[in-house]
């Protein structure tokens, strides 16, 4: 993990088995992850939003991965949530079909959690929609995901991470099966 420790020493990673009984409140701007007792999640959201509307979408579990439906252009996608991902990832086969919805298409080098560098394609997705929340100019890498999809029943079209989760406070509720984007 030394390649992950460029500014902060990391002693380990938390996984689904650690926080599966909790709801997670991500506040990337504040640099906090709050574990919420699921019985207080709605009250916490109401307190944080002051009654302003939120975007709430259902999640479906695929093993240990929470998944949401998303839309890019006319293309409906099934995306896993990876709160540790520095960027978003879509399967390589979407590179050509999503061409009209992308800007800044190029090849780049990506270093994965295994510290191995790979040449990949990257671009910014002009508009990605989850529920009624629209995200613009989302930096995205296109690459093979067969190693992950091989172990999943339905498979994924990609993963969302920091670019989506960091734009606002976000709650991931495993117990109630929903992803909540706060205003």
Model-derived segments and their meaning:
Residues 1-183:
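Pepsin/retropepsin-fold aspartyl endopeptidases
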């Amino acid at each position: 993990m030394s390649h992950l420790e460029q500014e902060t020493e990391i002693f380990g990673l938390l996984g689904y088995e650690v926080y599966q009984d909790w709801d997670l409140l991500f506040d990337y701007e504040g640099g906090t992850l709050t574990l919420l007792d699921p019985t207080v999640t709605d009250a916490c959201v109401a307190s944080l939003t002051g009654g302003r509307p939120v975007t709430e979408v259902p999640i479906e579990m695929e093993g240990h991965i929470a998944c949401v439906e998303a839309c890019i252009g006319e293309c409906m996608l099934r995306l896993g949530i990876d709160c540790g991902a520095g960027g978003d990832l879509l399967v390589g086969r979407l590179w050509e079909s999503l061409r009209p919805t992308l800007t800044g298409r190029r090849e780049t080098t990506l270093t994965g959690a295994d510290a191995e560098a790979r040449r990949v394609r990257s671009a910014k997705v002009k508009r990605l929609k989850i529920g009624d929340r629209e995200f613009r100019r989302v930096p995205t890498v296109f690459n093979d995901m067969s190693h992950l999809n091989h172990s999943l029943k339905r498979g994924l079209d990609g993963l969302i991470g920091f670019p989506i989760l960091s734009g606002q406070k976000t709650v991931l509720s495993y117990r109630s099966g929903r992803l909540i984007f706060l205003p």
